[in-house]
Amino acid sequence: MFRKILIANRGEVALRIIRACQQLKIATVAVYAQAEQHSLFVQQADEAYCVGPDTAQSSYLNREGILMAALLSGADAIHPGYGFLAEDAVFAQMCAECGLTFIGPKASVIELLADKAAAKKFARQQGVPVIPGGMQLKNEQDLRTKAKQLGYPVMLKANFGGGGKGMRVLASDHELRHQYHLIQEEARQAFLNDAVYLEKYLPHARHIEVQILQDHNGHLQILGDRECSLQRHHQKVVEESPAAILQPQQRQALYQLAQRLMAGLAYIGLGTLEFLFTGQQFYFLEMNTRLQVEHAVTEMTTGADLVTTQIQVAAGKTVQPKIATFKGHAIEVRLNAQPQENLLATGQLTKFRLFTGARVETGYREGDQILPYYDALIAKILVKQPTRLQAVTKMQRCLQRVQISGIGTNLPLLKQIMGLPSYRANLVDIHFLAHLVGDAQ
């Protein structure tokens, strides 16, 4: 087992990893930007090192500074959390070259799966269905030809995209020509690579994902499924476990696809296989090679401790192949400092009080500042009940009791969602929120 782990992240996920390390009696090292020197996660860690000024680019994405902190502290492993360097193959390789264990798959596997077009090609080779399209584009003429073959509407995506960035729904040749270079530039700035690809747009799909864990011996555990269809601009807002829409035979078919895909990968650690589900068919979207923001809903319904097990497997623990069973239904909402679309609210949390009957994951306290340099997530609020409808009702009560002031949030939207008859009846798809609030896709 590791003696000391450096956590290359911030906020609530850093605190979640610290808790897991404490359970395993592993010392923890935090890294932080100057603006966050008094943050809760810094105070909770056994040691802490400043790795740069306020911006994420200069601190939490500072590979060399983070590695230097790991070596100075005597850490023997680095946990990347999610976001930032969690799916950075270069960073994973640098860790290996420094004699540090990167808690995640090998750099070569991250590199394969980070390239969305390459990942879909791999899935096809494994006999896993993918959305029509998905081939990398050579030039603008190739773009128009493939769009005509697929038929409008189409989705234009960045090869190395993520977090809702670098993708657009396009309904005509005119829109395609107009958006092509804009998406390339967005991809270049966000992911340092302007490669893009086209795929067919599916108008009534649901987002279903499978949580997996695999050890060094290839022993695969399927730790349940989630539905994450409620999204704004391709960023998840509400997540549930299990995916209540699935019938037993559909769930079995989904897990067989997951097993087929994983059989071809020398994969170690936690991962999430994302699919679109429409017309009784699953289409592979991508694989996230890290801990997910929404991992806690799976923990609540399966009883698994995903972060602790992730660390143990990275340290060489063997697990037995299994398919987890569910107990109850869990819902997570993301309370964001985002009162309007793509607008990050900043300022002081003058009041911040959450309902004690829910599981809450947050890196903030009353009086803390929401800074403009990082993501909008303030807290994850989770509930579990015997049935989905009971869980929705409990979440509704929890949100009514949230007291937060000083900054704008999406709390009104979350309350609205929980009260909608269509949501309560589980009549949703990935465009549900866009239609609800009038967002352009």
Please name every model-derived segment.
Residues I7-L24, Q34, A48, L71-S73, ...:
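ATP-dependent carboxylate activation and anion-phosphoryl transfer catalytic cores
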Residues S59, P80-F84, S108-L112, P132-M135, ...:
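Glycine- and other small-residue-rich loops at beta-strand/loop junctions that grip anionic moieties
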Residues M1-Q125, K138-T145, T387-Q390:
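ATP-binding N-terminal substructure of ATP-dependent carboxylate-amine bond-forming enzymes
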Residues G166-V169, L176:
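Conserved glycine-bearing catalytic or ligand-binding loops at nucleotide- and phosphate-handling centers
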